[in-house]
């Protein structure tokens, strides 16, 4: 009799079966041998994914048809001018359509009950063939629950919802314009290295109000293009009743937020970005939903289990929101159709999936430290229904548009999250490197500059699995929110309000802040990943935190804005940080370090506070020492020949001290140093980041 296999082990026969079932599992295990004991988990996940895909094929005609739910569910104009309506409300006793078209008579247009909890209604056109429910009409679905309660609801498939005056709840507005927006530009090519500008339309104006899609299109997109970003991540687009939720309490999943304008204006924004060569990603929230019932998904059919788990499992205690039941056939249809809707109707080029950690585990990541022990990523704590949904979503996105981009926000470090589905992975293109901003905040908050640990910085910036692509960032919207601080605020604090004028001498605080702000962002950009992200305004050290209007601040918009005009004022030092960000991005576009293999770090010297590495044929040198500069400092390189400075944080246009002569040529010699065959001598002043390029390199 064979010996029993302990948890965390895998018999040879079981491993062989897993390798036979998962086409490229061998490649995954070759890249990460520590995953070998969990081969059966990958086998089970992959088989379950294929079973679900095959079931969709047998029962729905394939995922292509299945993901077009928005073409039949909701309300649609027919060729004859009539209206076809369809809903899924398994807990309802009766379903009706009402609105201003029938003077809000709740029961005059009943739906017909179909199988599997579906209901449909056909409303013929008027005798003159005109529409009974014209564009802009207000509508409601009326639900008669099994207990006899009459509920007024917005269709989960509503394409546009609006709130007028002092109304607390949103209204469903029928969106069927006579002249819908026609896209003029094709999608841009997939960037070889993504440089993402994390954006929020509503806060994009310096005025104390909610900005519009049009404002963003005509005033912010040109700035993004000028700064050298090739991708924008649009936050808070899916409709959310509570503005201060930052777009993370979704009420209408198919509706573009009306507080910024119309659906056609959002399409113009995306199309204009495409004309500039900018890829557009949507921040998609499928990890949870708002608890709102009158203008949300919650209790749509009068039960708590329509789209969500019933009972405690259906509630996220920390977020005070509802949790989807990913094993439900109709929930899968709803979510996959939602993904496709944003790709096809609005022209988005991919997604950043929010709250993936919460989806992956039954514990939702709450109270979990995630030590990196691989047993934390497998077993009963994993919500495999949610995992299969994410695999299906990635499969759909990359099948429809192979050049699309998907990014996972996962703090746990789930292995194979960004591996191909054929390897047993989940299929994301990138994951967010969420430990990096925490490290910078920790250093600024807890350590003196002279106590910064160079090895620890390098470890944090390079701690990623081989061939698992990461989006690096020094800070995102999370650090900008009230209760936290941006890097600029940690560095310069209150002096940002008094000492940013070029007419006044540098104070020690402002000098330190401006120099370290550039260095932190450059080393994160160059060493931290295969993509880079910045939250709007942080590139120039935006002087205030972010706080949306709410009761606690008397509904003030003062901190819910971005003061881009500060960079346009020649008398303020914000322009220096803005200039640096632009040139850093444009140099990456030219040299392509984000798409190059991971850097070779040749030096992390604790006493000298020096970090040196090579990537994409460039030599990066950072001197984090607060006071020591070094002449003739030897730095290793693989390349012989002549080098020149191509980026210098100490340059005058970046608010530096101009201590380096850019006409200087550096010659490497065949003198081995720090495991490099060649080396060169450089002058590296304190608090300076430097990039050298071999003059014989093609770029």
Swiss-Prot record:
Q: Where is this site: Transition state stabilizer?
A: 478
Indicate the disease this protein is implicated in.
Defects in GBE1 are the cause of glycogen storage disease IV (GSD-IV).
Write out the residues that bind (1,4-alpha-D-glucosyl)n: 104, 140
Q: Which InterPro entries match?
A: A-amylase/branching_C (IPR006048), Branching_enzy (IPR037439), Glyco_hydro_13_cat_dom (IPR006047), Glyco_hydro_13_N (IPR004193), Glyco_hydro_b (IPR013780), Glycoside_hydrolase_SF (IPR017853), Ig-like_fold (IPR013783), Ig_E-set (IPR014756)
* Keyword Oxidoreductase among record annotations: no
Amino-acid positions noted as binding substrate in the UniProt annotation, renumbered to this chain: 59-60, 88-90, 115-118, 330-333
Tell me the keywords, alphabetical order: Glycogen biosynthesis, Glycogen storage disease, Glycosyltransferase, Phosphoprotein, Transferase
The EC number on file is: 2.4.1.18
Q: Which GO terms describe its molecular function?
A: 1,4-alpha-glucan branching enzyme activity; cation binding; hydrolase activity, hydrolyzing O-glycosyl compounds
Q: What does this protein do?
A: Glycogen-branching enzyme participates in the glycogen biosynthetic process along with glycogenin and glycogen synthase. Generates alpha-1,6-glucosidic branches from alpha-1,4-linked glucose chains, to increase solubility of the glycogen polymer.
- UniProt name for this protein: 1,4-alpha-glucan-branching enzyme
How the protein assembles, per its UniProt entry?
Monomer.
Pathway per its UniProt entry is: Glycan biosynthesis; glycogen biosynthesis
- Write the gene name: GBE1
Entry similarity comment:
Belongs to the glycosyl hydrolase 13 family. GlgB subfamily.
> The organism sits in which domain of life?
Eukaryota
Q: Which Gene3D superfamilies match?
A: Glycosidases (3.20.20.80), Golgi alpha-mannosidase II (2.60.40.1180), Immunoglobulins (2.60.40.10)
Q: Which GO terms describe its cellular component?
A: cytoplasm
Q: Which residues form the active site?
A: 354, 409
Q: Which reaction does it catalyse?
A: Transfers a segment of a (1->4)-alpha-D-glucan chain to a primary hydroxy group in a similar glucan chain
Q: Domain note for this entry?
A: Binds its carbohydrate substrate close to the active site, but also via regions close to the N-terminus; this may result in increased affinity and therefore increased catalytic efficiency.
Q: Which residues carry this modification: Phosphotyrosine?
A: 170
Q: Does the keyword Glycosyltransferase apply?
A: yes
Instruction: Give one GO biological process term.
Output: glycogen biosynthetic process
